[in-house]
Every structure is written in structure tokens, then in C-alpha cells.
Amino acid sequence: MSSTYCGNSSAKMSVHEVSESSLSLEQKTGFAFVGILCIFLGLLIIRCFKILLDPYSSMPSSTWEDEVEEFDKGTFEYALA
């Protein structure tokens, strides 16, 4: 008699578990937010590795030489202090 009762209650529980196992709106929103954060983190990691592998590709070609020429001309006032 108890085995029949357990089998009967497990059938009822499986019907209720299916309806309760669906995610609520808050859980769906949370999983979507975590997924977006994981994608963003992955993109940042890829960008950082690209910069580490070739750090000078992201720099403009005329930076240091132009500033040195301006420094030699005396355009920087604080250089005298």
C-alpha cells in the first residue's frame, strides 16, 4: 500500500516540479545579465591579449618625435622651471 502511495505522489510531484522548475522573470533577467557580462569580459580579455601581443599597433605613428621637436623649440613653458 505504501509503494502505491509513493508512486502516486511522485507522479503528482513530477507534474508540479515541471511547472515550478520554469524560471521566473527575475531569474531569466539575472541569467541574461550574467551572460552579457560574460560576453563583455570575453571581449575585454581578447582585446587585452591583442594589446599584449602587439602593443605598438594601437599607438599613432607620430607621437614622440613631434613632441620632442616642440620641446626643443621651447614651446613648453614649464621646462624652464
Curated annotation (Swiss-Prot):
It is a single-pass membrane protein. Its main location: membrane. InterPro entries: Cortexin. Belongs to the cortexin family. It is found in: Membrane. This is Cortexin-2. Keywords: Membrane, Transmembrane, Transmembrane helix. GO terms for cellular component: membrane. The chain crosses the membrane at residues 29-49. It comes from Mus musculus (Mouse). It comes from the Eukaryota.
